[in-house]
A protein has these predicted regions:
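Residues that act as N-cap/strand-start positions at coil-to-secondary-structure junctions
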Residues: 19-21, 92, 98, 118
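Active-site metal-binding motif and surrounding structural segment of the metallo-beta-lactamase
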Residues: 42-82, 175
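Short, acidic/turn-prone active-site loops that include or flank metal/cofactor-
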Residues: 84-88, 139
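Metallo-beta-lactamase
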Residues: 15-16, 32-35, 41, 53, ...
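Zn-dependent metallo-beta-lactamase
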Residues: 1-31, 169, 190-193
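Short acidic-hydrophobic, aromatic-tinged amphipathic segments that line or gate anion-handling sites
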Residues: 95-105
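Short loop/helix-cap segments at secondary-structure boundaries that form the rim of catalytic
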Residues: 72-75, 87-94
Length: 198
């Protein structure tokens, strides 16, 4: 488990199929302990979380990031939250759905991104003095310092997807934590802008 900032830790699982890391987050913020998009984790990390944290919630950013949520719900006795538009498309039953503009436990704001690969794709914004943007499949970090959209064939209309991403630029963030690939911890807003304009 790697510490990104106080209250934000990340672990990764390398996907041979996609040839990039699938990332999960452990957030300990505002009296809550939250997992985001949990991929498989090492036994030592799972044990450390079980011994050191009382996980309240597991937040999923889209229908394709269920990953290890069921095992985490069982092991940590946590509730699973998912986007309202994606929940009916998931095999995993969710405890609560969320939608655009909602404030989630721990102080995470929901930003629904229309016209993405899944109808409920959502980013999460966390303000801890420094702004952190958390994304699932909206943007990926194939190369360090650079963000990309998924391949164009994943979208009904890639230009509409890019237009939807402009919503992210309204938020005051310096770091973006990606579910797939390499996160950017400084000047991330400019990287988002470049990805939209590419």
């Amino acid at each position: 488990m790697k510490t990104i900032a106080p209250g934000i830790q990340q672990w990764s699982f390398f996907s041979q199929e996609k040839q990039l890391n699938f990332n999960g987050l452990l957030l300990t913020v505002n009296d809550h302990c939250i997992l985001v998009d949990p991929p498989p984790m090492e036994t030592a990390d799972r044990t450390a979380i079980l011994k050191g944290y009382a996980v309240d919630y597991i937040l999923l950013t889209n229908r394709d990031h269920v990953r290890e949520a069921e095992a985490c719900r069982r092991d940590f006795l946590a509730k699973v939250y998912a986007p309202e538009a994606d929940a009916p498309l998931m095999e995993l039953p969710v405890d609560k759905t969320y939608k655009d503009g909602e404030l989630l436990p721990g102080g995470l704001w929901v930003i629904h991104l229309k016209d993405m690969k899944s109808p409920g794709e959502s980013a999460l914004f966390l303000d801890m003095g420094k702004g952190y943007l958390i994304v699932g499949d909206a943007l990926i970090g194939r190369q360090a310092g650079q963000l990309n959209l998924l391949p164009a064939e994943k979208f009904a209309d890639v230009n509409k997807a890019k237009a939807s991403l402009t919503r992210l630029l309204k938020y005051n963030f310096d770091a973006i934590l990606v579910g797939d690939g390499t996160s950017i911890l400084a000047d991330a807003k400019e990287a988002v802008r470049r990805a939209i304009e590419s």
